[in-house]
Regions:
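Extended, low-complexity, amphipathic alpha-helical coiled-coil/linker regions that act as scaffolds
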Residues: 1-227
Length: 227
């Protein structure tokens, strides 16, 4: 892998282009094998850009998480319109991959667009899963289904170094796990419910250029250990 803005190795570029083509040709379904290969290629790029500008590193972090999201989707999984938008952003502005070297402003704009499309989609899905538990607070299956999306969101936000939202996710994971372990489902659902609007508040503030911490009293409630 090369420095941002320079030509990437032919073998890597050929593999990336071929996997992306296979992924897009697979529509209207998600091709998990192509997504897995693209995730690996993004991880290679991320490892080679540890000393690069922050937006370059974060570009590959988000791209890797996006392809991991596609790979983890249940098969067969329908292709979404926002998937196409993110793929187009990656192809057009990936440092060292685009036909012409992107400027720092272009990289920042692409990163912002990827964030708005991908992270918001992740949060919306997580919100829908959490709502199913809120609607059926005694349902252990509904509570258990919250674990995967919450853990995936926690990993994504942690890699993006969004500490406040990461801390909120960690506390929520503790709440869900404790509710399942102690058969405290209804009380756990009640404690977990405020985490959704709090996450949306933090997300909107981040999109507006602010980084805020979650309500400490809410984090304490989520970390409460049932007796």
């Amino acid at each position: 892998m090369s420095a941002p803005g320079t030509a990437v190795p032919t073998e890597w570029r050929r593999a990336f282009d071929q996997c992306m083509l296979d992924l897009l040709r697979g529509r209207p379904r998600v091709v998990q094998t192509s997504a897995l290969a693209l995730q690996g290629l993004c991880q290679q790029a991320r490892a080679q850009h540890t000393q690069s500008e922050p937006q370059v590193r974060m570009f590959w972090v988000l791209a890797g998480h996006f392809f991991d999201h596609l790979n983890q989707a249940p098969a067969p999984s329908p292709w979404q319109n926002w998937h196409t938008v993110v793929c187009a952003r990656i192809m057009a502005a990936a440092p060292g991959l685009a036909p012409m070297a992107p400027t720092p402003n272009q990289q920042a704009e692409a990163l912002s667009a990827m964030f708005l499309e991908f992270v918001h989609a992740q949060v919306e899905y997580w919100q829908s899963v959490m709502q199913r538990w809120a609607d059926a607070p005694q349902d252990a299956g509904a509570a258990h289904e919250c674990l995967g999306p919450t853990a995936q969101l926690h990993m994504l936000l942690g890699d993006m170094q969004l500490d406040g939202m990461t801390d909120l996710c960690a506390a929520l994971l503790h709440c869900i796990e404790a509710a399942l372990a102690h058969s405290d489902l209804a009380a756990g659902a009640e404690r977990a419910a405020p985490a959704v609007p709090e996450m949306l508040r933090l997300l909107h503030q981040y999109a507006a250029g602010f980084v805020r911490s979650p309500d400490p009293s809410l984090v304490a409630v989520l970390r409460h250990q049932p007796v």
